[in-house]
Amino acid sequence: MADLQDEVHTTTDVDGAAGPFGDEACRADRADLADLAEAFVPVSDPDTEPLERAHAILATHPVADGYSGLPWALRHLPWFDLETGEAAVDTDVPRLREGHVGALFWSLHLPKGLDGDRAVGATLEQLDLVRTVVRTHPEGLRLACTAGQATDARRCGRIAVLLGPAGAAAIGESLGVLRSLFALGLRVLTLSGVSWASEAGLTRFGEEVLREMNRLGVLADLSGASGETVRRALVVSKSPVLCTRSAAHALRPHPANLPDDLLAELGAAKGLCMVPLTAKQTGPTVHDVADHLDHVRALAGPESVGLSGTYDVGTAHPRELADASCYPRLIAELLGRGWTEADITLLTWGNVQRVLRSADFTARAAQQRREPSTAKIAELDG
């Protein structure tokens, strides 16, 4: 029987931060927020027009975009050049710069129906494609795996590319494959659509996957996961979790949107809800998107809301937010609604930085007390 490591994690309270390194991780989160508050210096003139203020704020605190479907979109193009501009997609370097995007999570999700070895192989191909795209666009893009690397990329005038989320099927029911994908740069994994993370919630193997993700520094993405999976993940995970493309279910009942109770629980656990700019999930106008951001901020808190362009996934976007260049319009709308500059900087950059730093801290602490898990799904789930 493979050893089931850190079984004690399953009894941790969401907001109690109990456990062998939960207290330290929570202290690190609080320190991150304190550092951000202490270091914050306004960069815009409150007497100027909102759009002008938006550009000024974003020039210093760019957007960390939680979800881009660009890798899959590029697979179907015979040729592309993202540095000079690519009309066939919603995202290229000129538009990212115009929209003040400083970091971008590139989705490795696959079409439905791929599982087992086929899913693992297709994910490896996606990783290879992303690395090739970044390597061939050195003036605009740079791979990043940590908060520090993302900041370094921005300081060098590059847009940080973070790998993930990948679908849960990508690991092929193997923690060894999970570790291999991490070694190749994967930093976010979606916990849904597999037997160990289903409508019924996380199985024993699913919980062990999440613990191993914590040990490595792979963030859990809970967008599209069942309510039972979300709740259990908030209990088991020692790192903050992400919802890379979830808005408010109370405003728009899309299956990937979160109900109010889960938004509150996510905020209590210092997770991050990244609101997508898609008409299906948030509505047809920039005002609708701002309504969702207001709602999420009110329930989860300003430290638990982020942005997710969700461009290049084949879906319609709200008016005035058609592509990656349009973020200043959204920020101007929020400023017009009374959002403070401090809250805007958390929304665009600070919250993602906090989550990445916390995941790294948790991983380093976990690696001091546990070896790589040898658990097998057949042994834990039968």
Regions found by a protein language model. Name each.
Residues 199-234, 240-244:
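Loop-centered beta-sheet repeat module
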